[in-house]
Amino acid sequence: SAASDVYKRQIPEGTVVFPREPLVKVVAPIMEAQLVETAILTIINHQSLIATKASRVVCAAKGDGIMEFGLRRAQGPDAGVYGARAAMIGGCIGTSNVLAGQLFDVPVKGTHAHSWIMSFPDEYTAFKTYANMYPDACCLLVDTYDTLKSGVPNAIRVFEEMRNAGIPLKNYGIRLDSGDLAYICLLYTSPSPRD
């Protein structure tokens, strides 16, 4: 048989699907079908997982923009690139993945890395320097050392200093990469922590 004996049909990309609903149908002689089965399943399973999760997070955010930052936790470079693409299909407004941004013409956005914080003598100095560089878009990564004891308090200190200096706080916030996110978010939902 030849490759021309293989027939494939799939639903349009971005279509909402439900459990047990076929996404792709491949009709081919058994050997040809088995040759492509693993590749097709790997691509579809990973990307539909990411797009679905992104869609749920975007829906839960109720209009607040959600960004994709998954490259460092992806199962390899290709999964990072195509995971970013899937997150965009799921409704994310941007990615930190520069290659994905270039390949798929999607907005590249980001904050700073843990290495930025670690390159300064202390966390507060790193935050203050970043805030001075980006006063109109200041999002501080607060879990490099200790989220509750230093990260969030140092971020609040920097934001209060900005406000006291007359710098309008338009696009500012904190970013968490680790820990019990639900618990931390309950403690800190505004520029001043709750008691």
Describe each model-derived feature in a short phrase.
Residues 1-4, 100-102:
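Non-catalytic terminal segments and appended small domains
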Residues 2-10, 188-195:
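Conserved small/polar residues in nucleotide/adenosyl-binding loops
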Residues 14-190:
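Buried, small/hydrophobic-residue-enriched core segments of structured protein domains
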